[in-house]
C-alpha cells in the first residue's frame, strides 16, 4: 500500500477513535457522603450532675396572695404605674404551640397563655389588647422579672419553691404533667427506657432537673426553645423529648408520627410570674383568675386551644396564703 494511503488510513482511524471516546462530563461532582445536620443554635449537652438533684419541696408552693376586695383602699403603686403607662409588658415565647405561637395566617401571637394575658389586660385597662410582648427563652424568665424588663411572664412557667425565692406567682391557672414524647415505634414506653438515650429538654426548665433526677444515665441535650426539641427529634438527633404534657401535645400536633408515652413524672402547676416587689399586681392578677374561673372564660379558652388534651376538667382551684 502506498505511503500516502497508509498515512490517510492512520489519520482516519485516529479520528474515529477520538470520536468514539466518551466526552468529558461537564456535570458537577456530587458528594454522596452523609453529614448529620447541625444542632440548633444554642444547643449543648448538659453535664451530668455529680449527685442526684434534690427534690424541690416546701410548704404550699402554689399558695398565693388573696385578691383585694372591690373598692379596697390600699396603696397600689405597681397598678398605678401600669395604668399611667397604658400598656402591660408580657414575657412569653413563640415556640410553644397551643400556648404561645404565631398564627401562620395573621402573624399574630395566639394561644392559651396569650389569652390569659389578654384577660389580665381586659381587667386592668378595659381593653384586652393593651399588651406589649417580649419574647423570652425559659432561661430568661426570672431575670426579666427581676430587672422589670417585663411586668408579668405568662409562659408555661411552673411554680416551684426555688423560683419563689426570686419572684412571686399567681395562683395556678393550668395543671400539667411531665411526660415523654417519642417517635412512634421507637420502643420507648416509659422513662425507664430512656437509660443511655439522648433526650431533649429546654435550658432553665424544671423538666431538665427532674429528668436528670429520675433517669441520670440519659444524655440530655438542651436547647433554647421547645420548637428546637421538635426539630432534633424529627432529625433523629435525640431519642425523646421530656417536658409538660401540654407542651408535648403542641409538638405532637405538628407531626403525626410522634406520640406521648409513659406515666406522669411530676405535676407541673403553671402560674403567672410577677416581680417580688409587686404585691398589688399579684393580687390583681389573682382577681382576674378568679373571674375567669367563675364566669366560664377559662373553659372557653381551654376549648379554643387545648381540646387535644381531652375534655376540660375545669380550672384548677385557687390556694391562698393569707
Language model region names:
Residues 156-165, 234-267:
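A ligand-binding cleft/hinge motif common to bilobed small-molecule-binding domains
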Residues 89-92, 110, 191-207:
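Short loop->beta-strand "edge-of-pocket" segments that line small-molecule binding or catalytic clefts
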Residues 174-182, 249-288, 308-322:
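Periplasmic-binding protein-like
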Residues 31-153:
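Extracytoplasmic small-molecule ligand-binding "clamshell" domains
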Residues 15-19:
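C-terminal motif of bacterial Sec signal peptides marking the signal peptidase cleavage site
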Residues 38-73, 205, 272-310:
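Extended ligand-binding regions for polar small-molecule ligands
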Residues 20-24:
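Bacterial signal peptide processing site
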Residues 118, 122, 129-193:
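Acidic, polar ligand-binding/catalytic clefts
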Amino acid at each position: 500500500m502506498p505511503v500516502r494511503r497508509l498515512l490517510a488510513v492512520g489519520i482516519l482511524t485516529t479520528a474515529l477513535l477520538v470520536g468514539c471516546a466518551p466526552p468529558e462530563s461537564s456535570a458537577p461532582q456530587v458528594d454522596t457522603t452523609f453529614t448529620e445536620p447541625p444542632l440548633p443554635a444554642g444547643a449543648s449537652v448538659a453535664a451530668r450532675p455529680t449527685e442526684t438533684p434534690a427534690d424541690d419541696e416546701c410548704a404550699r408552693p402554689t399558695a398565693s396572695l388573696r385578691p383585694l376586695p372591690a373598692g379596697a383602699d390600699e396603696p397600689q403603686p405597681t397598678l398605678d404605674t401600669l395604668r399611667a403607662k397604658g400598656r402591660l409588658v408580657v414575657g412569653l415565647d413563640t415556640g410553644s404551640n397551643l400556648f404561645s405561637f404565631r398564627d401562620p395566617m395573621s402573624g399574630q401571637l395566639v394561644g392559651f397563655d396569650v389569652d390569659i394575658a389578654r384577660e389580665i389586660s381586659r381587667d386592668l385597662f378595659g381593653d384586652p389588647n393593651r399588651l406589649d410582648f417580649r419574647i423570652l427563652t425559659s432561661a430568661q424568665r426570672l431575670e426579666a422579672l427581676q430587672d422589670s424588663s417585663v411586668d408579668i411572664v405568662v409562659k408555661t412557667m411552673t411554680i416551684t419553691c426555688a423560683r419563689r425565692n426570686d419572684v412571686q406567682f399567681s395562683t395556678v391557672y393550668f395543671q400539667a404533667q411531665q411526660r415523654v414524647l417519642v417517635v412512634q415505634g421507637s420502643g420507648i414506653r416509659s422513662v425507664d427506657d430512656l437509660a443511655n438515650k439522648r433526650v431533649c429538654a429546654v435550658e432553665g426548665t424544671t423538666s431538665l432537673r427532674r429528668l436528670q433526677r429520675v433517669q441520670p444515665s440519659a444524655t440530655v441535650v438542651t436547647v433554647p426553645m421547645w420548637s428546637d426539641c421538635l426539630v432534633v427529634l424529627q432529625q433523629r438527633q435525640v431519642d425523646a423529648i421530656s417536658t409538660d404534657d401540654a407542651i408535648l401535645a403542641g409538638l405532637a400536633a405538628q407531626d403525626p408520627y410522634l406520640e406521648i408515652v409513659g406515666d406522669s413524672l411530676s405535676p407541673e402547676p403553671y402560674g403567672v410570674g410577677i416581680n417580688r416587689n409587686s404585691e398589688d399586681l399579684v393580687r390583681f392578677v389573682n382577681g382576674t383568675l378568679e373571674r375567669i374561673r367563675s364566669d366560664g372564660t377559662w373553659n372557653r379558652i381551654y376549648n379554643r386551644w387545648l381540646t387535644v388534651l381531652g375534655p376540660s376538667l375545669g380550672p384548677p382551684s385557687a390556694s391562698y396564703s393569707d
